[in-house]
């Protein structure tokens, strides 16, 4: 197969591993910067051009699109879909997952347990917003944040009001969530491919920090997840229409709570911790689904 990886930086661990895994299975791979693509959008002969040349058709495309370029990156991904490439995650699902509010609303609608969450733009009554989610301590997030950026733990009501007022000054959308104290700065990252949780790790925030993101100095260990945690990770992935996702879960006294569903999960932490070939599993999933698609197309053409 010919596989395109959409990424701004082919030197990143995840991109390198996906390329290695695909080439080990005798596929040709090209890493393409989506911001260097431009598109011809028409009904007769749509195309994608890249750095002065028209790109050939790819059998599959793997989106590794950073949150900062979601709009243009998913437009490029959508163009590849128009041309018949199989997407590891399709553009609609990626956009859905990147919209934190929309994704939480979809998960809640499907009965998936979440931390109590409030959403606001410029609340006139900060006190009511804080009370709505159970009071302090609570976590205040910028909707556009990633990897723990724009996330603040407010230990007291006064601190929460100050943080919310500061974020309001940025003219930003704000998520306010209950702080799950019993999680003790830990969460579980479940890596879902298709209908399976193929790996899971427990992430622990570093001393003095409440965010467990590995990019912020957190540590990771192997963990055995429960059947309930496995089921909720798969359901959350399917609810957003994703084939592959990193689902972050908090262990609360009332049961597992989904914090976030990541459409482009990093592979370094989970591969190095578990020793599993996650990249290889992703390529195998693509193989199975492109073969199924080609078989279906052949059957339709014969009929």
Curated annotation (Swiss-Prot):
Disulfide bonds: none annotated. It is an enzyme of class 6 (ligase). Keywords: ATP-binding, Ligase, Magnesium, Manganese, Metal-binding, Nucleotide-binding, Protein biosynthesis. One of its GO terms (biological process) is translation. Residues 104-287 form the ATP-grasp domain. InterPro entries: ATP-grasp, ATP-grasp_RimK-type, ATP_grasp_subdomain_1, RimK, Rimk_N, Rp_bS6_RimK/Lys_biosynth_LsyX. Its EC number is 6.3.2.-. Mn(2+) 1 binds at residues 248, 260. Mg(2+) 1 binds at residues 248, 260. It holds the Pfam family Rimk_N. GO terms for cellular component: cytoplasm. Its cofactor is Mg(2+); Mn(2+). ATP binds at residues 141, 178-179, 187, 211-213. PROSITE patterns: ATP_GRASP. Binds 2 magnesium or manganese ions per subunit. Mg(2+) 2 binds at residues 260, 262. One of its GO terms (molecular function) is ATP binding. Mn(2+) 2 binds at residues 260, 262. PANTHER family: RIBOSOMAL PROTEIN BS6--L-GLUTAMATE LIGASE, RIBOSOMAL PROTEIN S6 MODIFICATION PROTEIN. Belongs to the RimK family. This is Probable alpha-L-glutamate ligase. It comes from Pectobacterium carotovorum subsp. carotovorum (strain PC1). The gene is rimK.
């Amino acid at each position: 197969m010919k596989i395109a990886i959409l990424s701004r930086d082919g030197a990143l661990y995840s991109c390198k591993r996906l390329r290695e895994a695909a080439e080990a299975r005798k596929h040709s791979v090209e890493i393409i910067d989506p911001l260097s693509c431009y598109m011809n959008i028409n009904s007769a002969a749509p195309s994608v051009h890249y750095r002065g040349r028209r790109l050939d058709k790819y059998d599959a495309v793997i989106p590794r699109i950073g949150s900062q370029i979601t709009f243009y990156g998913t437009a490029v991904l959508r163009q590849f879909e128009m041309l018949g490439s199989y997407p590891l995650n399709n553009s609609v699902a990626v956009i859905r997952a990147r919209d934190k509010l929309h994704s939480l609303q979809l998960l809640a609608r499907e009965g998936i347990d979440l931390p109590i969450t409030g959403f606001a733009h410029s609340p006139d009554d900060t006190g009511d917003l804080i009370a709505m989610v159970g009071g302090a301590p609570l976590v205040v997030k910028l909707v556009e944040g990633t990897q723990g950026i724009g996330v603040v733990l407010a230990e007291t009501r006064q601190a929460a009001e100050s943080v919310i007022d500061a974020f309001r000054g940025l003219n930003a959308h704000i998520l306010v969530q209950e702080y799950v104290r019993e999680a003790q700065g830990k969460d579980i990252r479940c890596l879902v491919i298709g209908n399976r949780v193929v790996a899971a790790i427990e992430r622990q925030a570093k001393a003095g920090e409440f965010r467990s993101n590995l990019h912020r100095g957190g540590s990771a260990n192997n963990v055995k997840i429960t059947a309930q945690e496995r089921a909720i990770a798969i359901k959350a992935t399917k609810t957003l229409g994703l084939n592959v996702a990193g689902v972050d879960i908090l262990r609360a006294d009332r049961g597992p709570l989904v914090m976030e569903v990541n459409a482009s999960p990093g592979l370094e932490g989970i591969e190095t911790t578990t020793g599993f070939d996650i990249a290889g599993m992703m390529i195998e999933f693509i193989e199975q689904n492109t073969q199924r698609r080609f078989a279906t197309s052949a059957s339709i053409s014969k009929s």
